[in-house]
Each structure stands twice: as structure tokens, then as C-alpha cells.
């Protein structure tokens, strides 16, 4: 009986190995349930790998790599913008400024009053004072009119300012102009106005001349509850910080624009921030009150705004120094701590290769964006259109059959009709083919926003840069060589990079916002001419320069190929023409007749320093533990998960904090550290392996616990049987 009882407990045992430990809840685990094809589809997609876009080398290949999971949760990746003054932007003030009238000193008001009373008369000011004291009567218009025709603009402005300062919204004022007939005798006395009157058609009688404008300031009481709703903030542009979670920057901006009755291009920011992250960045809009902006932001989940300010100019793409990153890498092996410390120190000392990351080249290995760029540069518009519309396994589910149908029958109108909304460039291209004819590929391409079209040739530029950087590091290592390019003057370095990176920020935005209005950035001839000023301000290093010790490897820039660029005077310079020739191009051919596709060239740092890198190790117990507090959580005093003692912790994470300049990719920083592919496919596979390992470990723990329980039960049963036998023997003896 005891043995049966023991077996029953073992069979019904529900130890840890039977529980779901995937992200803490069973409902979160992906289930097959006969629908395996849908869940397995992402695994079958052909995604770009780093080696396919020239990312092959490391600054220190000997440094130990290690496994860490990036962006396991979006709370593991935090980005704070660094503004043009070098300040890290943090959301820490939720107060909303009210209508602010610029204060004027009392003595200045007295001076204005004395000056104006001489012209207007003290009785006018008394009338205004009486108006302010009078009760509101909606039946009549309560006003005082002041003839200010003889006052200049500055004096009229002073009148308005005095009314604002003295009556604080109880009275409003406005300037009214009206045409009045001017007596001929007055014209004769005002010969200086003769030229202004000549050439105007007049219908006045002989005793009159063309009318002049009479100016009147009307001072009036506002309607009850209205007050002064005119713009009275310190400057035209309202700035504010946007803290978002797991959202696309351009989507946040578009929603704000819709709520504020603005075009998307009228909500400005300095650059795109990561989607799967918690990010803080600066926005600006023109003449929208902080209250209205706050109301608009409340309509979006996972968006918080604050830190309002006022500026005279709008934000533009590239108006920043860089970004501050706080990142958690999960599933770090505790026994690898010493090796990880070595890898971190190496990265801090040597920096990393400033590759363009995978997001630069699209999400399809079968049709990377640079292939479209090559077709455009070679004037093969038919091929470019076909590549953009070509079926691919990385498509969203509804778009794939539309592509396949078009590929078979080339009915652009029918295909376009199946794509709803204006988000997809495929729809714009198909609409263009339907409108201009199935063979007018050049005109059809122009239906795609210009900034989006620029993405394609720029992706090819980026591919060349990556390949050149890899070959330069592989063949010459981490040393300066004669002919390497540096900026002529150090203070021009930042300006040149900022100019080039402004174009890059635009491209990054258009990857996520292809259908927005054109933004206020240099384009076409203007952009090429403006950038060329900087591109010629480099020079090759000499042997004497290198011997002087004045320059470091992080000073070296590599060109992005173009028709107006200085190439290195060493062996690297020839590599550009070799790589262009591989696809039938040359630098001269990059001066395209279509300015949208023309590539003048730019410069980009080859190595990025990581001197401000900080790190720490963090213990945690569950995959759901929040390890880094966001701006919002700090502001609201929302605690992160408590950290257990290392001996008691189930897992260890590596917390990183570092800054990067604009246009540098954090994924390339992490690649140098981890020595592993940072593609989404690789990260997904790593996380699956980590979770499988975790499940196996828990199963092993469960098996051990079960075995221990069985041993204990058997021992208990044996003890009970022995006790029963002894009792029975004693009874028999009696």
C-alpha cells in the first residue's frame, strides 16, 4: 500500500520541469497547435547577414567574444539624444508652461507712457483705464480707438506692449488699417510721397489723390471666457522631449501632426530612434501651445512628453551630437566574467569599425536596397522597378500575393487597387506605372518620394564603404599609412561629419517614413554644392605626419564614393574604382543626370572611439525582470526588479552605457564586443538556444528533485515496513 502511494505521488508530481518557464507565463509561449506553418515562416525568411554587406573585420579579433542576448525585451535598450550643445536629454519635468507675457520693467513702462502721451494725449489713457474697469456688456462693443497713423511701427508696438503689461489680458489690442481719401493740398505739402502715388490707377475726383492708409489701434474687452488667445510665448517654436516605448519615431510624429492639424513635415526632430527600445528625444512644432501638444500626446499609448521650451528656429535632421545608450545584454555566463572584462577593456581602448549596420540595406537578402541603387545609377529604370516589386520571402503576408500576381500579368492598376493606404512605396510605384504606362519606368519612379528614392543609391555607397573599411583593416591593420585622409583642420571635422550625417539622418527617417512631406534639408543641386565645400577639405597624411604622433587612427576618414570626392592617395584609393567597375560604374558616372540619384560623395570616420564606455554586471531571477530604469520610471519612482545575491541569482546580465556620434550604429559597437552576428535572425536563434538551455536545466533540476523525493519516499516506506515488522515480531513474542 505504501509503495502504491509513493508511486502515485511520483506520477502526479508537478515539479519545475512541468511548468512553463518561457518568459514567465505559459500563455506567452508560441504554440504550434496545427498552425506551425505560420509560426515557422519567419525562420524560413532569407535575411541579410553581415558578411553580405561587407561587415567582416574587428579592431581586435583576438579579444574573447561571448554570448549575450540583445533586445530580449524592449526595456533592455535605452537611447537618450545628445543635443547640439552636448547635453544628454532626459525627461524629468512634466510641468506645462502657461501663456507667458515677457515682463517689462516698470521704469521702462513709465518712459513709454511719457513718450506716447505727448502724441496721443493723457485723456486716451484715461479712456483705456475706464474701459478696463467697466463691466462686460455683450450687447455692445466696448472699445477705445486710437488714431496712430502718425506713429511708426516701433511706437505702435510699444502701445500694444503697454496694454499687455498693464491689463494682463483684461484688454486686447489690434491695429486696423483703412483706406482714406487724401486731400490734394496735403499731397502738395507732402512731395516726398509723390513717387509712391505715381503709377496707381485712381478713381478719385480732382480734389483728391490716391488714398493713404489710416492706422487705428482698437483697444477692446474680450468676450467672456475668451481672454487673449493670440501667441504670446517667448518664441515661435515650442520644443519638448518625447519619451516613447516600442514605437517608431515617425509614427509618433505623424500622430501628433494629425492631432495638432499639422502636416507630418511640420513636426520636426533631429533623428530617428530605435523602435524596439525606450527612447527620449527632442521635438519641435511651430505655434502650438504646450497644453494642446500635451493633449495630442495623450492619444498615444507609451508616449510621454515634457521639458517644454521655446526656440526661435525649428529643429532639423542632424541637429544633434549623438546618442547616449544604456543596454542590457542578458543570459551572460557567470563563469565568463574575466574574459568579458578583457573584451570590454579592449573595446574601450581600440574602438570599433564604423560600419553601416544591416538596417541600412533593407530586410531582404534576395533584394537588398543596394541592388536597386545600382540599377538606378546605371539608368536601368525597368530593372529598378522590377526589383522594388519583385516577390520576396520577407514580405508582410498580404503583400506577397500582390507582388506575385503583378509579376505574372504586369497589371499595375489591379495590383495598386489591392494595397490600401499610402504607406507602401509599392503602391506609389504601381500607381505611377498605371498612370504613365507600363513601360514608362522613369516617370513611375518619380511617384516615390524623392527622399525615399535617394535611399537606394546611398545604400550602394554604404556597401562600398563597408567593403573598403574591411579591406583597409585586413591588409594594413590598425596603423596609419601615408595617403590616409584626415580633415585639414580639426575644427572642420565635426562640421563635415554633421553635414554628411544630416543626409544620413534623412535616409534613416525615410526607411520608416517613406510617405511624409519633404523635409527642410538640402536636396539636389543645393545639397551637392553645399556638401562639396566640406568634401574638399581633407588631405592625405605624409610619413612626417605619422611620425609626429599628432594623428590617431580615429582621425582617419574614408570616402563614400562620388563624383566630387578626394580619394586616398595610397593603395586604398584604387579600390574604389575597382569595386565600382564590378557593376559597370565609375566615379564619373555617379554624376547622374537625375539629381535624385547623383552621388557627390562624403566622408565617414573609419574607427569610432569608445572611451566613455562604462559597464557593470547585474544579477536577476526571471526573464521578465526590468534591469534598467527608463526616464519615465525614474520620474515616477517606479523601481526596477530587486537584484538578488549572485549565489542565489538564476541569471546574469551585462549593463553597458556609452555615447556614439550621429550616424554610428550601436549594433556595430556590440558586434565588436560580442564577436557575433547582430542580425535579427541570429539574435532570435541565440535567444531560442538560451531558452532551450534554460528549459533543459530546469528539467534537470526537476529530475534531480524527483529522484531525491523518490529516495526519500522509499526510505520512509522502508522505515515504516521495518517498524511494522518489529512491532509484529514483538507481538508474536508476547
Swiss-Prot record:
One of its GO terms (biological process) is tRNA pseudouridine synthesis. InterPro entries: PsdUridine_synth_cat_dom_sf (IPR020103), PsdUridine_synth_TruD (IPR001656), PsdUridine_synth_TruD_insert (IPR011760), TruD_catalytic (IPR042214). Disruption phenotype: Neurological defects, characterized by behavioral disorders, including increased activity, disorientation, and aggressiveness. Impaired pseudouridylation oF tRNAS. The keyword Transferase does not apply. Its EC number is 5.4.99.-. It holds the Pfam family TruD. SUPFAM superfamilies: Pseudouridine synthase. It catalyses: a uridine in tRNA = a pseudouridine in tRNA; a uridine in mRNA = a pseudouridine in mRNA. Residues 505-523, 715-724 have a biased composition (Acidic residues). GO terms for molecular function: pseudouridine synthase activity; RNA binding; tRNA pseudouridine(13) synthase activity. Belongs to the pseudouridine synthase TruD family. Pseudouridylate synthase that catalyzes pseudouridylation of RNAs, such as tRNAs and mRNAs. This is Pseudouridylate synthase 7 homolog. The lineage of its organism: Eukaryota, Metazoa, Ecdysozoa, Arthropoda, Hexapoda. The gene is Pus7.
